Every structure is written in structure tokens, then in C-alpha cells.
Amino acid sequence: MRIIEQKPTLIVLMGLQASGKTTFFERYLRDRGYVHINLDTLKTRNREILEVTRCLDQSLDCVIDNTNPTKDDRRRYIRPAKDKGYHIIGYFMQSKLAGCLERNDRRERQVPKKGILATFNKIEMPSLEEGFDELNFVSIEDGEFSISKWIEDEI
């Protein structure tokens, strides 16, 4: 009998502030045992790096819940996870700017509008070439998420 070893998983969430990333994590991933890594919660990049390193060293499944708008932002997680043999899945939140601004206005802790606009202006669409094993679009309508497979030719 041959036992198949399952790779640990790194999930990288991508999208504007108030696009639904944390809600998506809470609804679909928290109860599956993923470690939640969020710069807003950890407060400093150093703490975030320590937590990512801990997860990778212990082969823990984890979710990076940050805006991750650029390839460089995503590379800081993908490269070391690939080196540790992780399966890497990306979820790109397809929220419209107007929808994010509206949701942000309803938040208790609001992000300044100029911060959301700055993130919007630097978004680079992800690609499988970055090292993702899987990429998905996530849309949100009336508080419900819809997930579809990434098709690079349609971007």
C-alpha cells in the first residue's frame, strides 16, 4: 500500500480593502483549520514575517489575508512557500471599487478613501506564472460569494 502525502496549503487572498477578504476567510476557511495571517491584526511586518515563517516551518495550512495588490507583494509569500513544498492557491476578490467604498463606509474601522484608491491604482492582476498552483475569482453580490476558476485568456 502506498500512502500519498498531502502538501500543506498556502492561500493568498487579493483585493481592495472592504472587498470581502476577511469575511470570505471567516465563512469558508476558518473552520478548516487554516492559520489566519493578517497584517492589520499583527500590526507590524516583522510580526507577520515571524508568523508566516512559523507556519511554513511547521507545515501549517495558512491564509494570507492582505490586499496583496502587486506581484512583489505576493512574491514575499509565494516564493518561500514554494521552497517548502506548499500547494499555493490564490483568490482574487472581484469587487467593484464603488462597492468597496460603500462597504468601507459601513465598517466600524474605516480605511481612508485615499488608501483604497491608492491600492486600486496599483493592482496587478495575478497570474499562474507567479507560482500559484490554482487561481480563482471571487465575486460578492448581496453578501453572497461566488467562486470561479481563473481563466488567464479572459483577463
Could you say what each language-model-derived stretch is?
Residues 64-71, 90-92, 114-126:
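Short, basic, helix/turn surface patches
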Residues 6-8, 59, 85:
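A general structural motif
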Residues 71-89:
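Amphipathic helical hotspot of TIR/SEFIR-family domains
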Residues 84-101:
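Conserved phosphate-donor/acceptor-positioning beta-strand/loop module used by diverse small-molecule
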Residues 54-57, 83-84, 129:
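Conserved catalytic network of the ASCE P-loop NTPase/AAA+ motor domain
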